């Protein structure tokens, strides 16, 4: 077993005792940091940054040099899997991700390959191995993937969407095609995450960014069912240590009980769910991660500290809380405000772990 100097994050996910509440930030390696912008400029474009193991490692480590974070998260993108399936991912300036060949019907789905994680996605595994080497056991490394439903939204819509009419048309008019796509994605994501674990990821997270646009019944059928399949297929132990799994559905606060039944170790919460209520509902079945509104980081330091204190009090005493934002950090947040946030979590949480 590789020794970890700081295993707070893993311990909290497994609801084991910790000295203070661990904290990291979604998108902690990102555009709010001037050093990230410099490295991205050096890479040329976003996907070149993802595909260069040394540069992906550099941006993964940048926030850890600034802040005493309790975990590193692999620098990558959720769309690496559809890109490896041959959909032609590209980024339009100011428009976000786009695909040259969106999926329109069952025949398109049938043509999609299941990517080999050590081949088409080998650059991700190289990044994982490089980051693990450079972390030198300081903190654990989180691997991740998008959920099948969320990946499918981009693959069918051809880009990001506000109304999701194209994929919902497929869901209601041709559910068989969508289920075939989701099934293929679930298999691909399982292989992808297991490869990340074998390469050195010590925990994994599934981001279901767009699950919250579904009705309760559709969420169960088209999103949660496939995340459950992935959880069932994941390696749960590696290098002599349990590998915790976190599920995060943005806008999914009403479905926490069902999510907790998947066998995952933790649930991510966005800022619209009250953490005290979430803890009451799931009890000690899973750990909880979250859930400060990322926009709170625009506030003055005293207000940020007040919000941290409120969320810590909401969760209360005991184990099983990983502090995070309710979604990714915004690109124009002052970096020193992120520092205030991280420091406040450690300082103010000590009283809850005595």
Curated annotation (Swiss-Prot):
Belongs to the uroporphyrinogen decarboxylase family. Pfam families: URO-D (PF01208). GO terms for cellular component: cytosol. The lineage of its organism: Bacteria, Pseudomonadati, Pseudomonadota, Gammaproteobacteria, Enterobacterales. InterPro entries: UROD/MetE-like_sf (IPR038071), Uroporphyrinogen_deCO2ase_HemE (IPR006361), Uroporphyrinogen_deCOase (IPR000257). Homodimer. The record marks 77 as: Transition state stabilizer. Substrate binds at residues 27-31, 77, 154, 209, 327. Its EC number is 4.1.1.37. Pathway: Porphyrin-containing compound metabolism; protoporphyrin-IX biosynthesis; coproporphyrinogen-III from 5-aminolevulinate: step 4/4. Gene3D superfamilies: 3.20.20.210. It is found in: Cytoplasm. One of its GO terms (molecular function) is uroporphyrinogen decarboxylase activity. It catalyses: uroporphyrinogen III + 4 H(+) = coproporphyrinogen III + 4 CO2. Transmembrane segments: none annotated. It comes from Escherichia fergusonii (strain ATCC 35469 / DSM 13698 / CCUG 18766 / IAM 14443 / JCM 21226 / LMG 7866 / NBRC 102419 / NCTC 12128 / CDC 0568-73). Keywords: Cytoplasm, Decarboxylase, Lyase, Porphyrin biosynthesis. Catalyzes the decarboxylation of four acetate groups of uroporphyrinogen-III to yield coproporphyrinogen-III. This is Uroporphyrinogen decarboxylase. Its main location: cytoplasm. GO terms for biological process: protoporphyrinogen IX biosynthetic process from glutamate.
